[in-house]
Swiss-Prot record:
Top-level taxon of origin: Bacteria
Catalytic activity entry: dCTP + 2 H2O = dUMP + NH4(+) + diphosphate
Keywords: Hydrolase, Nucleotide metabolism, Nucleotide-binding
Biological process (GO), any one: dUMP biosynthetic process
The protein's name: dCTP deaminase, dUMP-forming
Organism placement in taxonomy: Bacteria, Bacillati, Actinomycetota, Actinomycetes, Micrococcales
Origin species: Beutenbergia cavernae (strain ATCC BAA-8 / DSM 12333 / CCUG 43141 / JCM 11478 / NBRC 16432 / NCIMB 13614 / HKI 0122)
Length: 192
């Protein structure tokens, strides 16, 4: 069940769902707007010949911090990682989905490539997969609205919420844009 503004405020008010910092003005009829942080991960395309999800490639990206009053310029065709300014914490019976803002999509900015789902139990900043599919550069300002979180109540609490396993979860507690950790517990089924 998708939570309404009333339900979102109740979940935040009770402390079950946390957004830090929280601004009530960001609450929409069935979502909460989230803002862009000032940290970005740029891809160093000359460090590796290919990207291999099975391998640890620690020099694939580098962290860039922009001043709070300066924009990050995302050029046409570029892909960078960003993150929400807000830290999100979800209980074991609420999941969330990050969606882009329509106004930014109409300018050619894609907020996430594939990873818009946030598991129950997650805590941390949400990493954004930012792409410019327009023909002009796009200015990304720290603190600007970048997306919206929709919250869903599960039919029952998750048996193993994110971060509860013995091995932990790859992105639990992440701060800022976090590079891929696909190589950790990489799974590949033998296909004949």
């Amino acid at each position: 069940m998708l939570l309404s503004d009333r339900d979102i405020r109740a979940e935040i008010g009770s402390g079950r769902v946390a957004l830090d910092p929280f601004d009530d003005a960001m609450v929409q009829p069935s979502s909460v707007d989230v803002r862009l942080d000032r940290y970005f991960r740029l891809f160093d395309n000359h460090k590796y010949a290919v990207i291999d999800p099975a391998e640890d490639q620690p020099e694939l990206t580098r962290l860039v911090e922009v001043d709070p009053d300066e924009a990050f310029v995302l050029h046409p065709g570029e892909f960078v990682l960003g993150s929400t300014h807000e830290t999100i914490t979800l209980p074991d019976d609420v999941a969330a989905r990050l969606e882009g803002k329509s106004s930014l999509g109409r300018l050619g900015l894609l907020t996430h490539s594939t990873a818009g789902f946030i598991d129950p139990g997650f805590t941390g900043h949400v990493t954004l997969e930012l792409s410019n599919v327009a023909t002009l550069p796009i200015m990304l300002w720290p603190g600007m609205k970048i997306g919206q979180l929709c919250f869903f109540r599960l039919s029952s609490p998750a048996e193993r919420p994110y971060g509860s396993g013995a091995d932990g979860s790859r992105y639990q507690g992440q701060r800022g844009p976090t590079a891929s950790r696909s190589h950790v517990k990489f799974h590949r089924t033998h296909v004949e």
